[in-house]
């Protein structure tokens, strides 16, 4: 299958495929087949996390794919209860073991959990993991500007990626502007808005014009903005559809029409300032 697609460049000198597959809510016992199918289709970037409970299955799919490790881009994430110098390193070692890998291409802090306020300690350990080579690049998820600024002020090191909720109903322009000013790549989770956009008239009009699905239009919007994007599906036909988005281009008016869908209260997931462990 074709694997040609766009890549993004990180400020640490590395690069990544712009389009990947997320495996949130993919059960561990089917993760291997889903990952192998995605790689067969042409995906080279897989995004998992410790809390997903499927790192073992993801690792099995990678091993069974027959694709050389250096051709793949594998990301996983540190969960909220493992922030801290030693606990972060231990959690990372556990993830590597489950994945069956000796390095990951990207290791991410999953949430800042500011009420606990240990994310800087976690970041300091991740800098060490990067310097040792077991995490080739390091990033964060769900960090607001104040969290990113704290990393910069206290460590001098900014993430290469901030993975955030981002879709046409919740476009986070101010945060994306901060990313652009500091050479941080924006990566979108929930990039399709959890299906709430399928009936949106303007998106359907754009889809008809380009003879594409609404999902393909939204994914192409992300890539034309320069975002990394990780849509999730376990259905082979949908995986194929999501992957084939680089052979058409949205026009300026299309991009403007999608920009107009933004709303101030469009968030589907938790607020990073409030999301925390139950006991925190």
What are these model-predicted stretches?
Residues 69-82, 105-112, 166:
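A short, structured active-site edge motif that brings together acidic residues
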Residues 112-280:
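Beta/alpha (TIM)-barrel catalytic core signal, keyed to glycine-rich beta->alpha loops juxtaposed to Asp/Glu
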Residues 5, 35, 55, 59-62, ...:
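Generic structural signal for well-ordered alpha-helices
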Residues 45, 103-106, 137, 161:
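Residues at the N-termini of beta-strands
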Residues 1-72, 125, 278-280:
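N-terminal binding-site loop/beta-alpha segment at the start of enzyme catalytic domains
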Residues 26-38, 84-99, 146-149, 170-171:
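Short, acidic/polar
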Residues 11, 88-109, 128-132, 153-154:
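CE4/NodB-like, metal-dependent polysaccharide N-deacetylase domain
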